[in-house]
Amino acid sequence: MTITATVAITCALLLGHYLNRMATASHAQRVRGLRVRALLEDLEILRLLQQHRGLGAQHEAAAVALRDAVAASLTQRLQQRSAMPDPHAVAADWAQLRDTPADFDGHSRLIDSLIAAIDEREPLGQACRTLEDVARLRGLCVLASNQGGCTPGLQARLTSLCRRLGGDPDVELKRLIGKLERGVIHAQQPRLSPPQCFALITPLIDARLRSIQQRLQHDSLKGLPAAHKPG
């Protein structure tokens, strides 16, 4: 065999090995991309479940209309989610909760199971659980306002939540907690209506969720080869 032929064979083998590695990396990245899309969808489902729970005790026409729209969006997203990687059983439980919007604890159990499913695939559990604490504060304050004030049991739940969230360094969260404590939690008669409670804290919840989504997208891009990164 001539030197030229040997060099040609060696180059062909090296090229084949390189192309195989590129194909493997490309496939792995496609799989990772699909899983990130599924996680992002789960975070949207989490947001909608928390909203549906927070709207569940409200009877105002605008709140009922928004709750119906949230329920329709949830049903559609869960149908789409079933075709994505890492499916879960949220859709089956949601079918029952859709008809019982005031079932606060039922929503909370479903949300906890969704957060656990997310945490199994990506280390987002702590951020999602803190987000859920804030969303639960919103929902319980709506409930307290709707029923004309806190029962001792409800006040104890809210006080425990506020204490747990009190360690959060977010100044805006502390301000909102103070307003809810004065206006609902420790007030003999609520000074904030259910829609006001819901509207007060929803922007903070949405902002925190966006932060989790952006972190997930950023982390997924860090593993990309330069040629695969957008821009």
Predicted regions span which residues?
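Hydrophobic alpha-helical segments
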Residues: 2-231
